Amino acid sequence: MSNIDNLTSRIIKDAEDKKRIILSEAEEKKSKIIAKKQEKAASEEKIIIEKAETEAVAREERIISSAELQARNEKLKSKQTVISKVFETTIEELCNASSDDFKGFVKTVILNSTLAGDENLILNEQGKKMIDSDFVAELNREIGSKGNITLSDKTGNFKGGFILEKNGIEINNTFEALVSSLKDEMGLEVARVLFS
């Protein structure tokens, strides 16, 4: 019986030893798997954090860029408003010219133009108060032999200046048209003077 006890004891001891080895190997595998998973999780966490930081920086740059663009556009819009106001003020000042200054303007433009001499002079309501048939007669005398400009009965719908019309063709010398043509040419110069 002692052999059986020894054999049983040895089998139990061998089983215990195998159990310890198996449990030790399982614990080692478990530790390796956990360490590997923790390493992978840390690596993925690092990648996710780096990606989030990169996206945050890119988003911040986009927001700043958008804000700068919007500010630049608002500034440009304000400058364009100021420039437009300058040209509108110029038209108003021309419209408020004295009768003598307005007559001088009409005379200078007509005498320096290449005309047939028989055009109709179209004025707005204010212009009709300043220019009369005596002025037109004097103008025709200065033009010379081809001078036959007539004062039109038609009242122009414009702020100031005048229109010369013949056979449906108009030469537009209104202040609005003259300032508008200068606006394209002088817009940059006006901006330079105003905003430098």
From Swiss-Prot:
It comes from the Bacteria. Keywords: ATP synthesis, Hydrogen ion transport, Ion transport, Transport. One of its GO terms (cellular component) is proton-transporting two-sector ATPase complex, catalytic domain. Signal peptide: none annotated. GO terms for molecular function: ATP binding; proton-transporting ATP synthase activity, rotational mechanism; proton-transporting ATPase activity, rotational mechanism. One of its GO terms (biological process) is proton motive force-driven plasma membrane ATP synthesis. Produces ATP from ADP in the presence of a proton gradient across the membrane. Belongs to the V-ATPase E subunit family. This is V-type proton ATPase subunit E. The lineage of its organism: Bacteria, Bacillati, Bacillota, Clostridia, Eubacteriales. The gene is atpE.
